[in-house]
A protein has these predicted regions:
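Bacterial Sec-dependent N-terminal signal peptides
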Residues: 1-33
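Short, compositionally stereotyped local motifs that mark structural "simplifiers"
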Residues: 8-12, 514, 518-682, 691, ...
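Acidic, contiguous N-terminal accessory segments
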Residues: 24-166, 397-404, 408, 412, ...
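Feature activates predominantly on carbohydrate-active enzymes
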Residues: 102-104, 110-321, 326-330, 337-348, ...
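Hydrophobic faces of well-ordered beta-strands that scaffold small-molecule active sites
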Residues: 168-172, 199-201, 286-290, 349-351, ...
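Active-site neighborhood of glycoside hydrolase catalytic domains
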Residues: 299-304, 310-415, 422-431
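Flexible, acidic glycine-rich loops studded with aromatic residues
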Residues: 401-406, 411-416, 422-562
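Short beta-strand-plus-loop segments that form exposed binding edges in beta-rich domains
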Residues: 737-746, 752
Length: 768
């Protein structure tokens, strides 16, 4: 079986090289690369190896570590078949609490030929040490069945390690689509493996209420179930159109009631306690979110006195919110959170506070009276009043409040923590920390894991600079980072894992490791080493993008396609007749010579035969396209803004024109906001005869045409995505047209390089 030549991607050496593990008496030599994600602060190789045996014991110096020891024993027993004993006092593997320098979660791990010692500065630190120990073992340690013929040896090492940030989180939206307790636990297992310690549980939204509130039983009796909505129907369509079972609605979340097909589910309070206990053993805190005052349709539809008017539904943008003018609505919200705070024994609760439709508030006499009585001038101030009122209630319950970055707009209390999610509100972190409030980074451009992944997604996460424009004092207020999994378009557990992993690993390393340790190439190598482990765990991760080609490629004379893949366990098949590759299609085994215009279709396959993404690329045999004879006189480009609400670039010119703006580069003009449809025209000035590469990044859709030929098709609604195309151009000016649309704070960027791979400054590229 031919595998992807992932080593071709790697240029950096591993932190630790190859260890020859033959020093342990009776142990055959074992070749083992030390490869841990996230990378440790300090790792020193020593001589020898520790071998796990049937008589290995796990000792605890501190009784509170018994759950951690039992967790480790269970982890090591499944694949080995050993009945590992847990005892108080020292063992072959000893767990202890001690004075380890660093933030909460710091640990040391020493592995010698006859023992392993893990010392943490907290329970979470010991768990972090256990997860590093876990990754030192062969990936087969993850097997749920006994594996025979494996030497359970790890290299002798000394590790000193500590997290960069105290908050290393993942959010799961279980409202838009529901996930069972077992499915949530699978996610917690992956989080623990990579030292992530905060699980943000988005329990309610307009599309479903997922937690039992005993005082209000209709929230789950009715609010947890719905008829198929537009998201469900689109998922079903994609599952059929693309032959993708991961996009189908799981049957165990469907029931028939009085002839109606209903989708949903919810957690009882006993379920919640079960998950809390499971997470606690793994060193993970759970932060519950009941989003309010918006995103509450499942509540306001089932109980009177919660919304402004009896008629509930959707406004111009968002759903009918809670009525902050009614005391009955405030009482409802506090009663819900009273039950919630009793269940979750943690410091934080999350109120949401985003995307509130305020139309009703402007018409509601109760809201207007509340504003008058409290000297509030705008409905935005009324929202802040509601948030502050709830925060005082949380504080009385011994909790601190987290909210999405909209809570900044009305002013922050001293105890509020902000989750910065709106990438286009670039000063959110600066404003928050300038007021002395903590901030958690989760900008949607990088950290929304429901956004389609491309070859740049992980790098943009890994290379995020959280310190940009912040003083050292402000930097100290960064609690950490979090990835968010919004599930409108994620109907199944398999699809959720596919969207989140392996990007989750990049977030984990960003949150744990020191900035000076950042090395993208080295991370790619360590990530590559994780795929076998994830396969054995049964995780439905996404095979990273194939590299070595663009969507459109130009060549003159003779070309070649050289495909690389980061996952060494994956197998690549391809076709050239337009059909979808199968396991019976030719296997990619090395560079392919191209002498004529050829359309390639590639598909990766997991070791279990499951199909990955289908990727199409075109290699065009070309000649240099002649330039125009008359040179344009004006530098830059001309952008025409249309009031566009559609989702196809070809339809932009049908919308009314709002204005025309000169721009020096491909960009969104500063005055252009709201419903955006741009048509940017001018000429591309090719400095010389060459094959040029055009990388077009946009959120949402975009297209690029040069010399009346479409070079990049990045059309349709989507998150940040880059598509790359090439064209052979003669020196001189070439007419170009770039189209772009977006409805909510998007991105637009075009990068041009020559055949030497060097970027070309925009100052000489464009004219009109």
């Amino acid at each position: 079986m031919t595998k992807c030549t992932h080593k071709q991607l790697m240029t950096a050496c591993m932190l630790a090289g190859t260890l020859m593990l033959g020093a342990c008496t009776g142990t055959p030599p074992v070749t083992k690369e030390v490869s841990i994600v996230p990378i440790t602060n300090h790792l020193e190789e020593t001589n020898g190896a520790f071998v796990l045996k049937s008589n290995t014991s796990i000792g605890v110096i501190d009784a509170e570590l018994i759950p951690a020891a039992e967790y480790l024993a269970d982890m090591l027993s499944r694949a080995t078949g050993y009945d590992l004993k847990v005892k108080e006092g020292e063992g072959t593997i000893t767990l202890a609490l001690g004075d380890v320098q660093g933030k909460e979660g710091a640990y040391t791990l020493t592995a010698e030929s006859d023992k392993v010692n893990i010392t943490g500065n907290s329970y979470g630190g010991v768990i972090a040490g256990i997860e590093s120990l876990r990754q030192l073992f062969p990936p087969q340690i993850e097997s749920k069945e006994i594996v025979k013929g494996t030497d359970w040896a790890i290299p002798a090492v000394n590790i000193q390690d500590a997290p960069r940030f105290e908050w290393r989180g993942i959010m799961l939206d279980v409202s838009r689509h529901f996930y069972t307790i077992g499915e949530v636990k699978e996610l917690l297992d992956v989080m623990a493996l990579y030292k992530m310690n905060k699980f943000h549980w988005h329990l309610t939204d307009d599309q479903g209420w997922r937690i039992e509130i005993k005082k209000y039983p209709l929230l789950t009796e009715k609010g947890a179930w719905r008829k198929f909505n537009s998201h469900d129907r689109e998922c079903i369509r994609q599952s059929k159109t693309n032959n993708n079972p991961d996009m189908a609605i799981p049957e165990d979340k469907i029931r028939i009631v009085e002839g109606d097909t209903l989708y949903g589910g919810y957690y009882t309070q006993e379920d919640i306690k079960d998950v809390i206990a499971y997470a606690k053993i793994r060193g993970i805190d759970i932060i519950p979110e009941i989003d309010m005052p918006g995103h509450m349709l499942a509540a306001v539809s089932n109980y009177e006195g919660v919304s402004c008017f009896n008629e509930t539904g959707w406004g111009s943008v968002f759903s009918s919110p809670v009525c902050p003018g009614k005391d009955s609505a405030l009482e409802f919200c506090k009663n819900v959170y009273t039950e919630l705070t009793a269940l979750f024994p943690y410091k934080y609760v999350h109120i949401g506070g985003d995307e509130v439709e305020k139309t009703n508030w402007k018409k509601c006499p109760d809201c207007q009276k509340r504003m008058h009585d409290n000297n509030l001038k705008t409905e935005e101030e009324l929202q802040s009043w509601f948030i502050h009122d709830m925060e005082r209630f949380f504080n009385e319950k011994g909790k601190e409040m987290i909210g999405w970055d909209e809570i900044i707009e009305g002013g922050l209390s001293k105890t509020a923590t902000v989750m910065w999610w709106r990438s286009w509100v670039k000063d959110a972190a600066t404003k928050t920390t300038a007021q002395g409030n903590p901030v958690i980074f989760t900008p949607n451009g990088q950290f929304y894991l429901d956004y389609a992944e491309d070859k740049n997604s992980m790098a943009s996460i890994y290379n995020l600079d959280t310190t940009d424009n912040l003083t050292s004092e402000q930097q100290s207020l960064i609690l950490g980072v979090q990835g968010n999994i919004w599930c409108e378009w994620i109907p199944s557990n398999a699809r959720m894992q596919y969207m989140a992993i392996p990007r989750l690993l990049a977030i984990a390393e960003l949150g744990w490791s020191k900035p000076e340790q950042k090395d993208w190439s080295a991370f790619q190598q360590r990530l590559s080493d994780q795929f076998e482990r994830l396969n054995i765990m049964g995780i439905n991760y996404r095979i990273p993008d194939l590299e070595g080609f663009n969507a459109v490629n130009a060549f003159i004379g003779e070309g070649a396609i050289n495909v690389t893949c980061l996952d060494p366990t994956a197998e690549i098949h391809y076709t050239t007749d337009g059909s979808t590759p199968t396991l019976q299609s030719p296997i990619y085994e090395g560079p392919i010579k191209v002498t004529e215009t050829t359309d390639f279709t590639f598909c990766t396959f997991r070791p279990n035969g499951k199909k990955g993404d289908i990727v199409k690329t075109r290699f065009i045999k070309s000649e240099y396209t002649p330039s125009v004879t008359a040179a344009p006189s004006n530098p830059g480009l001309k952008a025409t803004w249309h009031e566009f609400k559609g989702n196809k670039c070809s339809e932009i010119e049908k919308a009314p024109v709002n204005g025309t703006y000169p721009v020096e580069d491909v960009m969104i003009p500063k005055k252009v906001k709201g419903n955006i449809g741009l048509i940017i025209k001018g000429y591309f000035n090719a400095p010389q005869d060459d094959i040029y590469t055009f990388a077009l990044l946009s959120d949402d859709g975009s297209t690029l045409t040069i010399d009346s030929e479409q070079i990049v098709d990045n059309d349709g609604p989507h998150g940040p995505k880059e598509i790359v195309g090439q064209k052979a151009l003669a020196k001189g000016y070439h007419p170009m047209e770039l189209r772009y649309f977006d409805q909510n704070g998007g991105q637009l960027k075009l990068k041009v390089t020559g055949s030497d791979g060097k970027g070309i400054p925009f100052t000489h590229l464009y004219a009109h």
